[in-house]
């Protein structure tokens, strides 16, 4: 594969991840599966849903969820610094989500939905440690932020040999948890394969076989090959919430359906629950296989920072460290 093709796939992964997140957010965190699926299974265009169904917070259509927003912060950091710098990334993260920002607003499950963006509790706790300079400031929980936010890092460092180390550093800023790190590293290796080699039906098997043996591989393999289930049923089976391994298993199951970008994102939307991080992952994996032309231009235009992320992704793709 030519260098230009790899750069386009890196760009596609970034844009595909963030656009998928924005397309999903109006129906993020809807856990009444029966009602939700009945309403959406026959809806031909569930993306950017005009009715905001998220029961936890209200925000503008086309904006990013907390998962996409972390992805965006990392993207901006990498472009502005021409690479990853842990201290500068921690500073940028704190400035974006910390005191005085739109995310630093009272939120209580007794008063829902909140008006404005949501900040997960483990992020709030991590911010307190970031301020002290702790490089492993994250909370010890296994959460889906780990893989949902790192696509720009993979796009920049695919093929460099530095990916595992940088992924661990980024993840432990918010999630100082081994399962979170290993999940993110596997997500990164699979995305790296797609960026460097394009479509490959054997990609998952190859990456899994080359991944160091640990206790999580069977969980990923089980979900990926669970072809008898629809993605909606797989999400119910493995877990529709934000925790790992279930959230990641739902994303793996979806990417093995061999659907195009639009169909994959729509499938993820219709499966409900904590679907924004799954959309981030699926959007990156699928867009990296098909290239930037697979992402509908009208989806990009409906994303509030669509043009900005395209420009950042273009700049980052020219800085790939391979």
From Swiss-Prot:
Annotated disulfide bonds: none
Keywords: Eye lens protein
Tissue note: Expressed in the rhopalia. Present in both the large and small eyes.
Entry superkingdom: Eukaryota
Gene Ontology MF terms in the entry: structural constituent of eye lens
Pfam families in the cross-refs: ADP_ribosyl_GH (PF03747)
UniProt family annotation: Belongs to the ADP-ribosylglycohydrolase family. J1 crystallin subfamily.
Name of protein: Crystallin J1A
């Amino acid at each position: 594969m030519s260098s230009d093709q790899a750069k386009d796939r890196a760009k596609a992964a970034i844009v595909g991840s963030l656009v998928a997140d924005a397309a999903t957010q109006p129906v993020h965190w809807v856990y009444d599966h029966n009602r939700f699926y009945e309403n959406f299974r026959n809806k031909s265009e569930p993306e950017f849903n005009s009715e905001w169904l998220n029961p936890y917070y209200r925000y503008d259509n086309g904006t990013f969820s907390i998962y996409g927003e972390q992805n965006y912060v990392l993207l901006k950091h990498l472009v502005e610094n021409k690479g990853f710098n842990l201290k500068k990334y921690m500073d940028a993260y704190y400035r974006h989500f910390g005191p005085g920002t739109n995310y630093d607003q009272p939120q209580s499950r007794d008063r829902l939905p909140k008006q404005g963006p949501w900040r997960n509790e483990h992020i709030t706790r991590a911010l307190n440690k970031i301020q002290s300079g702790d490089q492993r400031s994250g909370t010890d929980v296994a959460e889906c932020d780990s893989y949902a936010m790192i696509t720009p890092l993979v796009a920049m460092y695919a093929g460099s040999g530095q990916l595992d180390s940088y992924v661990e550093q980024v993840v432990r800023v918010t999630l100082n948890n081994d399962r979170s790190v290993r999940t993110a590293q596997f997500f990164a290796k699979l995305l790296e394969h797609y960026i460097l080699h394009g479509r490959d039906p054997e990609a998952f098997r190859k990456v899994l076989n080359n991944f160091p043996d640990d206790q999580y591989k069977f969980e990923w393999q089980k979900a990926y090959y669970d072809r008898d289930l629809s993605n909606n049923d797989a999400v119910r089976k493995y877990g529709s919430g934000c925790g790992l391994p279930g959230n990641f298993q739902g994303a793996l199951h979806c990417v093995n359906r061999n659907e195009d970008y639009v169909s994959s994102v729509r499938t993820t939307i219709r499966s409900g629950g904590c679907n924004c991080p799954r959309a981030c992952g699926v959007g990156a994996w699928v867009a990296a296989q098909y290239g930037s032309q697979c992402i509908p231009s009208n989806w990009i235009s409906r994303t509030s920072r669509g043009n900005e992320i395209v420009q950042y992704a273009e700049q980052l793709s020219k800085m790939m460290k391979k």
